[in-house]
């Protein structure tokens, strides 16, 4: 959670509008190496995901699946190689634009302080209440949210949802951003 909070607290980087539009298209990992201390989990890793293609990464614990997503989200920087979206290095894409390109559902939901609505929107003013409700309906969590005392305005606490419902909320969060 601390790493996600640190990511959300980072100042927004600015890039020219022409670069923003370039940040659509294929996702490419080209000869990426990354490790935690002396332990490399990715060594000369290369992969291309075509725009619109859906990919599931599977593997043993510690194989690097989560690391791949953290590199793609810009939470980590590779030691070697490049990570690009539409030919633009991930580090050159603003955080907001990157979130419109990538939808990611993590294994464990990272709750932020605030209401159920804020769990879905992450405070992004471009995601309207209507968009959040549509995403919740798509994920199958809308009825459970509406059944809460204050619906989408209910303040989130740990026991408000079951583990499965938190996972559905995570899917709604990813869908609300309407990634490319």
Predicted features and spans:
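Cytosolic ends of transmembrane helices, especially the final helix of ABC transmembrane type-1 domains
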Residues: 1-8
């Amino acid at each position: 959670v601390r790493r996600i909070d640190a990511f959300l607290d980072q100042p927004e980087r600015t890039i020219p509008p022409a670069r923003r539009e370039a940040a659509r298209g294929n996702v490419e990992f080209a000869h990426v190496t990354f490790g935690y201390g002396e332990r490399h989990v990715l060594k000369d890793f290369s992969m291309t995901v075509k725009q619109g293609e859906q990919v599931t990464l599977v593997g043993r614990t510690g194989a690097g699946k989560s690391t791949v997503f953290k590199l793609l989200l810009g939470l980590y920087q590779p030691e070697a190689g490049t990570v690009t979206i539409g030919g633009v290095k991930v580090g050159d894409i603003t955080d907001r634009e990157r979130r419109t390109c990538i939808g990611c559902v993590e294994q464990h939901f990272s709750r932020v302080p605030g209401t159920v609505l804020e769990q879905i929107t992450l405070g992004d003013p471009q995601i309207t209440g209507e968009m959040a409700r549509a995403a919740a309906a798509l994920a199958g969590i809308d009825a459970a949210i509406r059944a809460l005392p204050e619906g989408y305005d209910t303040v989130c606490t740990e026991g408000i949802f079951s583990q499965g419902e938190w996972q559905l909320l995570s899917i709604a969060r990813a869908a609300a951003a309407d990634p490319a």
